[in-house]
Amino acid sequence: MEENYRRYPIGIQNFEQLRNRNCVYVDKTELVYRLANTDSVYFLSRPRRFGKSLLVSTLEAYFQGKKDLFKGLAMERLEKDWNVYPVFHIDFSLTKYTTLFDLQEQLNLFLLRCEKVYGAEKEEKTPAARLQGMIRRAYEQTGLPVVVLIDEYDAPLLDSNFNIPLQQELRNELRKFFSPLKGLGQYLRFLFITGISKFSQMSIFSELNNLKNISMRDDFSAICGITERELLDALRPDIERMALANGETYEAACAHLKRQYDGYHFSKHCEDIYNPFSLFNAFDAKEYKNFWFSTGTPTFLIDLLQETDFDVRQLEGVEATDEQFDAPTERVTSPIPVLYQSGYLTIKGYDPEFQVYRLAYPNGEVRKGFIESLLPAYLELPGQSSTFYVVSFIRDLRKGDIESCLERTRSFFASIPNDLENKTEKHYQTIFYLLFRLMGMYVDSEVKSAVGRADVVIKMQDAIYVLEFKYDGTAREALAQINSRLYAVPYRKDGRRIVKVGINFDSATRTIGDWVIEVEDTVDNL
């Protein structure tokens, strides 16, 4: 094996397998030890592919006393006793749930597997009774309290988002199955539940009034994912190889990784967290691709945005309260908590006076991927079409050919299906926003987010384009607004040529009607 070869834990969610294969592991065992020895009943919410299952597997190995797996890690010096507890681990992500039988079968397989070890009693007919009896017998046979690990508890409910009657059946089945846990405290050493949705939203563990939710706590905010300190300390060789493969400096590679995969915050004062799935895939491929987003298209979330008529332009910075995060899913009126828990938005700030969180896209990977998914939904065109147009727009601008760029924009809107003809001004504003925001993934562009700014500013190597749109107005009015409101003034000292473009959008033809271009060639020294 090459001296510099590194095996990354891509697709490996089992701690024992990861350690035996000598995969790269960022040591989280000090947090695991604190979690296991501070309290006994926990819940953790994190987005998909963020390390929840590996964390659960690490807890399983710890409670099973597998000391050898922790050699060289913080746990080796922290743990002295290494007791071997009976561990019941159920992972709900192992199958898809399209019927109630799918869930019942999964529960039965789990119970049968455990009953082979601890036995069964014929009086125990229901899954809940079997679970209760199994925990009691495990305690009696070993003399040690039981550890229960429930991974991705909400997988059945997320699979049934589009089938509300089925979702209610699945919710009731899960609620019945886990109901005995409340009365089994004397037999339990540790209970840990993970999922994407907060447990209070799904109304499954409502009877567990001692369940401690650590999802938004500072002290456990880094238990999943990779902090910037961990990246620079433990993964420095990987950054160096990444830089070498892409012909850039170490510092440039750090900046590229941060821009693409960093930016997650799961509490008020959380340090920056990198997406581990994307980071390890990037190191393995030595490319800055959109790895996390490519593993799942957020169809449900896009439908929710459209059903609630949410203005997607607000996703660059929107506020939410604690109460919104806790709203039951059947009463959700805002898509924001769902977008946060799914990983498409993250905490970017907190106002303690009003107890309000500011949320936004975490990083470039998520912003680009989500916008690329949103555009087809608003255009009713294939996603590749919008991306192809954006690339063509950029090529036109790099050649300084603003006329061709605008002609291409006109053709783009003309290609939108006729059934959008009754859409409102807001709908077309959203399309413009998404189109130019996607362009911002490739070039330096700004899209209007406040009064007193131009609709779009695009910065190319030799020119800055200031664009203003009017809906059923005139191009001259749009240009006049650029001049009267001094939209171009902040860029005059830049030294690049300033191109001001007034554009009219014609609702009758559903595309750009006309435009006016005005060029400033000299630097204003005001």
What are these regions (language model features)?
Residues 444-450, 456-460, 491:
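C-terminal amphipathic alpha-helical interaction region
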Residues 147, 463-465, 499:
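Structural motif
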Residues 1-424, 439:
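Phosphate-binding site recognition
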Residues 490, 494-526:
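Domain-level recognition of nuclease-like catalytic cores that cleave nucleotide substrates
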Residues 433-449:
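A short acidic/basic microdomain associated with nuclease active sites
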Residues 167-172, 471-488:
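Mg2+/Mn2+-dependent nuclease catalytic core
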Residues 432, 454-471, 485:
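Conserved catalytic cores of phosphodiester-cleaving nucleases, focusing on short active-site segments
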